[in-house]
C-alpha cells in the first residue's frame, strides 16, 4: 500500500512536462505536447455558433450580433468564475498538503463554491492530500495535463479530483441522434460535458498509472 510520502515522491520525480501559462502549452524535451482538454476538443462535434445564434435571434426577436455578444459575455464570466474558485481552493489547501482532510477549514474560503468544495473534502476526514496542480504526461502519446487535486484514502487508493464550476452538467444527450455523439474513436459517447470530463479524468488516470508503474 502506497503512503502519501511515497505518492508525493513519485509524482514530483522527473520527468515532468514544462508548461507555458501564457500560451497554455505543454512541452517535453523540446517537443510540443497537446493538452488533455485540446485532445478532447478535437473529438467534439463542431458547434455552428453563427447558425445557432441566427436561430436564437429569430426566435427571440434579437440581432445575431447581440446573441453572439451575450454568449461571449457569459463565456468570459464563467471562465473568470472558474479561475477565481480554483485559485481560492488552491490557496486554502496549500498549507494542508500531506496532511489529513480533517484539518481543512471550509471557512478559509470566501465564495460559496469554494466553501462547498472544502467542506466536501473535510468530510473525507482520514484521507490525506497528496498534491494539487500536478503536471502529468504521456510523452509517447504527446499529451499532457494538470490535475487539480490528488487525494490518498486510508486504504492507499489514489483519488483524482477536478473542480468544475459549470452552471449545469449534462450527463446524457437529450436526443439519440448520431449528431449528438462525439467523433471517432469515441463516437459511442454523448457529446456532453459529462462525457468530456469523464475522458479528462480517464486521461489523468492513465498518466498516473504510468507514473506509479
How would you name each of these model-derived features?
Residues 1-84:
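Charged, glycine-rich intrinsically disordered N-terminal tails and low-complexity linkers that flank
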Residues 2-3, 9, 13, 17, ...:
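DEDD superfamily 3′-5′ metal-dependent exonuclease/proofreading module
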Residues 32-36, 63, 101-102, 111-112, ...:
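Secondary-structure junction/capping motif
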Residues 42, 46-49, 91-95, 123, ...:
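A structural signal for alpha-helix termini and helix-coil/disorder junctions
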Residues 68, 117-118, 205:
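A generic alpha-helix structural signal
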Residues 73-186:
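Catalytic cores of nuclease domains that cleave nucleic-acid phosphodiester backbones
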Residues 189-213:
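Metal-dependent nuclease catalytic cores in nucleic-acid-processing enzymes
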